[in-house]
C-alpha cells in the first residue's frame, strides 16, 4: 500500500481497502525504521494519529473531503505549523512553536491530510546538500540500494562502509528522503534557487517549483522574498498536480499571489507530442556537466524527437551572469530577512545583558551557523551606500535581462525547455564537504536558480544512471503555464517508467538495511 501513488491510495481509502489510521500507523512504523536517515526533525505522532482518526470518522459517514483526506504528508521545517515546533534547523529557532499555520499547511489540513512531521534541511534553507542544519545531515536512501552498493563496493574497500553514504541534495533534503522512503505520499519543500528540484533529482522523486505568485508564501519563513516559492515533492507528476490544485490560488495574506481564480489542475493524458517544440539551451552544456547527465539529457531530447516533437537549440545569452547575479540578490535579501532574529521577540536569546548591542551580537553569534552569518555579511556589504548602485541595482538590471531571455525563447515558439537539474548524480558526504557551502551552492544551483529569478515554473522528473542512482532532468515552462509543463513532464515520466517502479525496488533493496539500522539504534540507546 505504501508503494502506491497518492491517487491510488486515495482510491483505496475510499473503497475501504485500508483505513486512514492503518495507513498512518504504517508510515509511522517506517519513519522509526528509517530514523537513521535523519529525514525528520520532528515526528508529530500524536497529531497524526488524531488527524487520521478524524479522517476515518468522515470516511465512515461518507463525507470524504477529497483526494487528500487521510493521506500522510510531511512539511519542511521552515513552514509555520501551529502547536508544532518550527526550527529552520537552527539554534536560533530551537523551541519556537508558531501560533498559526502557513497558508499551504492549512490548505492541506483543510483537505484532511495527515501531518506526519517536519522534515530536515540546511539551516534556514541555505545550502544544497541538507548537511548544514543543527540537527545533522540527511542521508540519501539510495546510498543503501543494492545496485549502488554493488557498483561502489571496490571503492569502499578498507573504509568504514557508512562513510560512503550519499547526500540528498538541498535544501529540502528531508522532504525528498521522506517521500522516497514511503513515510509520506507528498511533502512540502521550499524553492529559492533549486531547493526542491535539486534534492528531488538526487533522491529519485518528482520536485515541482510552481510559478511565482501561484502559491502563497504566507507562513514560509522567508529567505529571499522575491524568489521563494513553496515546492511540492511527490512520487509521480500526477500526484504533484493533485497537491498543486489544493494549494494554488489567491491568499489575502500574501499580496504577491495571483488575483484571478485558479482552475483545477487536472492533467490530460498526452499521447501526441508532435505539436510540441522543445528548447535545448546551448549555454547549459557546461564543461562541468558529467558525461552521465549529458548522455541522459541527449537521450531525453532524442526521445521527444523520435515521437515527432520539434527539438531545437536555443540561446539564453545572459546565463553566464546568472549565478553571480543570484548571489548578490540572494544575500542582500537574506541580510534583510535575518535582521528580525534579534533575540527580543522570539527565538534564541543569549544570557549577556551588558547592553542591547552586546545581546544582539551574542545572540546572533550563538543562533546562526557560519553559513548564515557569512551570507548576512555578504548581503550587508552589497547593501552599503557606497556599493548599492554597483552591486544590488546592477544585479536587479541583470535579473531583468535574464528573465527577458526566457520570454524571448518562449515567444519564438518554444513550449518547454529541457535542461539538466544538477551537474552530476548525488555524491558521497565526505566528498561533498571538501568544498565550502558557498562553492557547492554555486555549482549545484547553476541550472536551477535562473528559473527563480524569472518566476517560471519548473519540474524535475528523473531517470536512472548506469551507477544505479537517480539523475534529474528539468522541464521549464512559461509563467503560469504550470499545467502544460506538468502535462509534458507526465508524458516523459511515462516513457522512462520512473520513479515509482524504481522507488519500490529501492525499498525492497533497503528493507534489510533499515531493519539492521533500527536494531543498532535500539541497542545503542539501551
UniProtKB/Swiss-Prot annotation:
GO terms of molecular function: ATP binding; glutaminyl-tRNA synthase (glutamine-hydrolyzing) activity
Active site annotation, chain numbering: 76, 171, 195
Record keyword Cell division present: no
One GO CC term on file: mitochondrion
Compartments where found: Mitochondrion
Keywords: ATP-binding, Ligase, Mitochondrion, Nucleotide-binding, Protein biosynthesis
Domain of life: Eukaryota
Enzyme Commission number, as recorded: 6.3.5.7
Catalytic activity: L-glutamyl-tRNA(Gln) + L-glutamine + ATP + H2O = L-glutaminyl-tRNA(Gln) + L-glutamate + ADP + phosphate + H(+)
Gene3D superfamilies reported for this sequence: Amidase signature (AS) domain
A GO biological-process term: mitochondrial translation
Pfam families: Amidase (PF01425)
Protein role: Allows the formation of correctly charged Gln-tRNA(Gln) through the transamidation of misacylated Glu-tRNA(Gln) in the mitochondria. The reaction takes place in the presence of glutamine and ATP through an activated gamma-phospho-Glu-tRNA(Gln).
NCBIfam families: gatA (TIGR00132)
Quaternary structure and interacting proteins, as annotated: Subunit of the heterotrimeric GatCAB amidotransferase (AdT) complex, composed of A (QRSL1), B (GATB) and C (GATC) subunits.
Family to which the UniProt record says this protein belongs: Belongs to the amidase family. GatA subfamily.
Protein name in the entry: Glutamyl-tRNA(Gln) amidotransferase subunit A, mitochondrial
The species this protein was found in: Canis lupus familiaris
Gene: QRSL1
